């Protein structure tokens, strides 16, 4: 009888753990969704809270890490922010990529961070590589946050080449962008800059 009681208690415990994991999974997904809602409403501090909750419940949620990165990156564009926020964004994008190497949005976020950081030329080289990785990754992730077209991504790549002093590569990319989208204002402005 004692053996049956022990088995019953163990089974009850195991089943409750499965239910807890399902609950945590649902709650982490809900927090991730809430984070993107807050992000899209430009409430970056609340987005951070929601994404942090999601990650604490499920550290493997690539898009929650990605959301943390984009929220930090968006906050870094506010005056009087410091390099620590950029570093947090970078770490979040790297965590997103570790969880899912096909997360092209996280690769683009990482490229943005490296471009903004500008500590050394290798930042621009790494940003270009991140863009290449994004272009080779899952296209379903594209255009969800802060980018409207593939042209925008190529323009970022062109800016990186420009800052590396590789104006020929930068100009080549801009010409390609303008062939497909002759009215693209960013590409037109960069072309003028490259003419100097």
Model region roles, listed by residue range:
Residues 69, 74-81, 111, 116-121, ...:
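Short coil/turn linking the two alpha-helices of tandem helical-hairpin repeats
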Residues 26-57, 77:
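Alpha-helical segment of the N-proximal tetratricopeptide repeat
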Residues 20-24, 56-62, 95-105, 135-150:
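Flexible helix-coil transition and linker loops at the boundaries of alpha-helical arrays
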């Amino acid at each position: 009888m004692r053996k049956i009681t022990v088995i019953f208690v163990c089974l009850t415990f195991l089943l409750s753990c499965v239910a807890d994991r399902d609950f945590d999974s649902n709650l982490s997904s809900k927090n991730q969704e809430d984070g993107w809602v807050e992000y899209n409403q430009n409430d970056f501090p609340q987005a951070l809270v929601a994404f942090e909750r999601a990650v604490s419940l499920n550290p493997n949620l690539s898009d929650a890490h990605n959301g943390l990165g984009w929220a930090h990156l968006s906050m870094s564009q506010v005056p009087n922010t410091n390099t620590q926020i950029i570093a947090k964004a970078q770490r979040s994008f790297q965590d997103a990529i570790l969880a899912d190497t096909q997360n092209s949005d996280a690769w683009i976020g990482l490229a943005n961070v490296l471009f903004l950081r500008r500590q050394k030329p290798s930042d621009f080289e790494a940003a270009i590589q991140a863009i290449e990785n994004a272009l080779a990754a899952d296209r379903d992730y594209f255009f969800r946050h802060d980018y409207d077209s593939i042209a925008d991504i190529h323009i970022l790549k062109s800016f990186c080449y420009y800052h590396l002093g590789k104006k020929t590569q930068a100009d080549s990319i801009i010409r390609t962008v303008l062939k497909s989208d002759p009215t693209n204002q960013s590409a037109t402005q960069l072309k003028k800059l490259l003419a100097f």
